[in-house]
């Protein structure tokens, strides 16, 4: 359903971005960001600072929050003593600064939340040390076929968030189908987690409700023999938790809140953005965080063009999802990327940066 909001022209976007960057750089010197200078893990140890979230993707609006992401090196003492820290997070400013070793670990897994830090627009890096520049110059070391599983995993999680948001504002029979789909997704992993059982031993389906307060209801046909009671109790608990989670958040004000604040359409937009980034990594060997080419398409999704009159994702949007899944699968099959990153070269990069710190720090 069209929201009626006109998309800004590229020229207007560019002017707004330049003004934003000026204000953002100015804000970093303010009191709210004093922790960047006073935290013992940060200060002169910061290797890079950059934009995160919607500002980094180019999907921000005038009401978007500012997210800052970055990396900080270890001290000489921490390097020599084998010590480290995980990250520094400041909730008030939506800032996360990863310790260099943790960032390297996440980058090797092609973690979407961190690999995007390596693909910002040049002007979106708010600070870069020599070590930070060296890391960016070697960004391709971290690109591998692991992107398929990591990005697909994040996309699946985003799809479930979208599906959950959609279910919470749906009519009862539709919501029941969403619950059933979530249970079926969980049930796929039961054979790996619990004692084996025949494929047709647990059948889940929807039929006319016995509960007078419902139109449709989920039913179970179960045929298990000599099955461990504790495993069955755990399986039942997993399914019950899913039903309970929908019941907690599926009512009244929160549903309308999700629609009013465009949360559903934002989940839909980020799902497509993840597929786009994954395809670029697999096909081009590049991390492209700022989605200039698809900006208008992504913003149309965010603005609700692919929601119907009931605020549900349209059939067309689900077709788009399937198209992107197919593109990712094709790209994965034909990519030139290695199966895993070159651990030897990454180790050499880490050693070079650590050696520089040890020699320079007095």
Regions found by a protein language model. Give the residues of each.
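Small-residue hotspots
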Residues: 271-274, 278
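Short, solvent-exposed loop/turn segments at secondary-structure junctions
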Residues: 54-57, 74-76, 122, 279-280, ...
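Helical scaffold of the NTase/Pol beta-like nucleotidyltransferase catalytic core
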Residues: 17-50
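Short, Lys/Arg-enriched N-terminal segments with co-localized hydrophobic residues
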Residues: 4-18
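Catalytic metal-binding acidic patch
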Residues: 53, 57-93
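Conserved NTP/Mg2+-binding pocket subregion across the NTase superfamily
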Residues: 91-263, 267-270, 289, 299
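Structured mid-to-C-terminal alpha-helical surface segments
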Residues: 24-29, 141, 145-155, 159-160, ...
């Amino acid at each position: 359903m069209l929201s009626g909001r006109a998309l800004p022209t590229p020229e207007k976007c560019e002017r707004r971005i330049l003004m934003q960057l000026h204000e953002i750089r100015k804000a970093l010197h303010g009191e709210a960001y004093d922790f960047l200078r006073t935290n013992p893990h940060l200060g002169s140890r910061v290797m890079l600072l950059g934009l995160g979230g919607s500002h980094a993707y180019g999907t921000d609006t005038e009401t978007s929050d500012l997210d800052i992401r970055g990396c900080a090196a270890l001290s000489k003492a921490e390097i020599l003593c084998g010590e480290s820290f995980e990250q520094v997070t400041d909730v008030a400013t939506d800032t996360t600064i990863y310790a260099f070793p943790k960032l390297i670990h996440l980058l090797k897994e092609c973690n979407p939340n961190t690999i995007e830090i390596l693909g910002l627009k040049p002007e979106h890096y708010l600070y870069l040390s020599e070590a930070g520049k060296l890391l960016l110059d070697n960004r391709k070391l971290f690109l591998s076929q692991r992107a398929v599983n990591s990005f697909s995993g994040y996309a699946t999680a985003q799809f479930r968030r979208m599906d959950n948001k959609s279910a919470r504002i749906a009519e009862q029979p539709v919501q029941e189908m969403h619950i059933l789909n979530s249970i079926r997704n969980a049930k796929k992993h039961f054979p790996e987690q619990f004692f084996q059982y025949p494929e047709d031993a647990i059948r889940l389906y929807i039929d006319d409700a016995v509960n007078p307060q419902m139109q449709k209801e989920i039913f179970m046909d179960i045929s298990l023999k000599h099955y461990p009671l504790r495993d069955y109790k755990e399986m039942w608990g997993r399914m019950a938790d899913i039903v309970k989670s929908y019941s907690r958040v599926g009512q009244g004000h929160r549903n309308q809140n999700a629609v009013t604040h465009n949360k559903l359409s934002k989940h839909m937009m980020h799902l497509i953005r993840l597929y786009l980034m994954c395809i670029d990594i697999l096909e081009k060997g590049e991390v492209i965080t700022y989605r200039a080419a698809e900006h208008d398409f992504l913003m149309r999704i965010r603005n609700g063009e692919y929601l119907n009159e009931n605020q549900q994702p349209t059939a067309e949007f689900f077709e788009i999802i399937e198209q992107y899944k197919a593109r990712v699968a094709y790209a994965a099959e034909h990519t030139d990327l290695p199966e895993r990153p070159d651990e030897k070269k990454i180790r050499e990069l880490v050693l070079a940066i650590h050696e520089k710190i040890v020699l320079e720090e007095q």
